[in-house]
Regions:
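Structural recognition of an alpha-helix C-terminal capping motif at a helix-to-coil junction
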Residues: 46-53, 66-78
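Internal acidic/polar
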Residues: 1-4, 90-115, 149
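Sigma70-family region 2
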Residues: 12-13, 39, 50-67, 85-88
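Short, charged helix-capping/linker segments at alpha-helix termini
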Residues: 12-21, 31-50, 161, 183-184
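C-terminal edge and immediately downstream basic/flexible tail or linker adjoining helix-turn-helix-like DNA-binding
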Residues: 10, 92-98, 103, 118-119, ...
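Arg/Lys-rich amphipathic alpha helix in sigma70-family domain 2
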Residues: 60-64, 74-95, 110, 118
Length: 184
């Protein structure tokens, strides 16, 4: 965001309206990231709350070496990992009847068969991404879904750009294989 730097400075000087605006600007992208990484709305909303609270508390530690969104993704990623660790050993979660947020829902102008097919494809893609190992899921979500540059995604993951590109290549290959297996 163009004037995040101005808002960060205002927030650091105690302007609560600047803090509110700054966090509100990034709320949707953090929630979307949480949905993709956690796989369900409830955990994603919890990750969003924890991320925004942590960002509020630690805004003074943000050095500005990367975009604020990159810093927020790093925070959210750690909370997603905690959420997944808590879920280990718990019974499988039931999926709500509503479609996952990641599913693409075309406009009403499309024929019902096309709409159903697109929804089915969206669900398959969502499930295939969730089935990827964490390191692959992280890179797919940051680069291909959130659209971060290779540099910002590498910063968010704490890896070199070359390592990120290599991991992205392997992640895309595994995702293609999973989707091809699901289509059979």
């Amino acid at each position: 965001m163009p004037d995040d730097a101005r808002l960060i400075e205002q927030a650091r000087s105690g302007d609560s309206a600047a803090v509110d605006e700054l966090l509100a600007r990034h709320q949707q992208q953090v929630l979307r990231f949480g949905r993709q990484m956690c796989g369900n709305e409830e955990d994603a909303r919890e990750v969003l709350q924890e991320t925004l609270l942590a960002a509020f508390r630690k805004l003074g530690h943000f050095r500005g070496e990367s975009l604020l969104s990159t810093w927020l993704y790093q925070i959210a990623r750690s909370f997603c990992a905690r959420s997944r660790r808590r879920a280990v050993g718990e019974p499988a979660q039931t999926e709500p009847l509503e479609q996952p947020e990641a599913a693409s829902v075309p406009s009403d102008a499309e024929p019902p068969d096309d709409t159903a097919h697109a929804r089915e494809m969206g669900i398959m893609l969502h499930d295939a991404i969730l089935a990827l190992p964490e390191g692959y899921r992280d890179v797919i979500v940051l680069r291909d879904i959130e659209g971060l540059s290779a540099e910002n995604a590498a910063r968010a993951l704490g890896v070199e750009v070359g390592a990120l590109k290599s991991r992205l290549h392997r992640a895309r290959a595994e995702l293609r294989a999973r989707l091809a297996g699901a289509a059979e």
